[in-house]
Amino acid sequence: MIREETVFGPIFSRRLGSSLGINLLPEKGKICNFDCIYCECGWNRDGRNDMVLPTAEKVRTDLERMLKKLAAEGTPVDSITFSGDGEPTLNPEFPRIIDDTLRLRDQYYPQAKVSVLSNATRVHLPEVFNALRKVDNPIMKIDAPTNELVAKINMPAPGYDLQRVIEALKRFEGNFVLQTCMLRTENGERRVESGERGSELVFDSSSPEVVGPMMDIVRLLKPREWMVYTIDRATPMQGLVKFSPQEMKALVQPIIDEGVTTVQIKGAVEDEN
């Protein structure tokens, strides 16, 4: 689902409540350095109609106009959320936009959280890390525990290195949210149009090669929360199978039992600290 505006919503988020979205990528387009098999925005190749990124000035103007309107109407906002059509930290003015957003949040909705949904590929950059440290909810994605498995589910741009991501996330010292999508491919088949990258893909978040090493990453990083969810909308790859909340809880139960972190499962918090 491609966003058609820079500031959109608010919409109800199963994870964040009443969420006002900010899209730092092109309106009616998509730019991302991941090409996830489950992305609701579709494949990267289908979304590059407009390569013009919104400027910090446009984001500030659009956001202030929306916040004024919502405040006057008495509309609740729980989170101002950077998501949208791709990876928000790819916008070169991301640090300035974060500063502007925090100022406007404090002015109009001081109780709201500022959240950033990111694939964590640029956290190693000082300017990106410093900006993310300022927000309430830096929500960083790791879906799989090895470069080979990340290549299957996220199909990152060349140069991705999971170990570099992990080392960068350590700098948060636990003050971030780790996000993981759980799914499996149906019958181990990748059903896509002719010409798409690869011809077959087998991935299962419940397999030993995924679930055990993923929990080791959680133990290492000790995020303040592990947000575990599954697919909820149409996906560009056909034949993906969602997990039930019960399946996901069973998979992460060791982390809950150990009290490593709070685990949120598809919006239902299992607070077992």
Label every model-predicted segment.
Residues R15-T61:
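Canonical Radical SAM [4Fe-4S] cluster-binding loop centered on the CxxxCxxC motif
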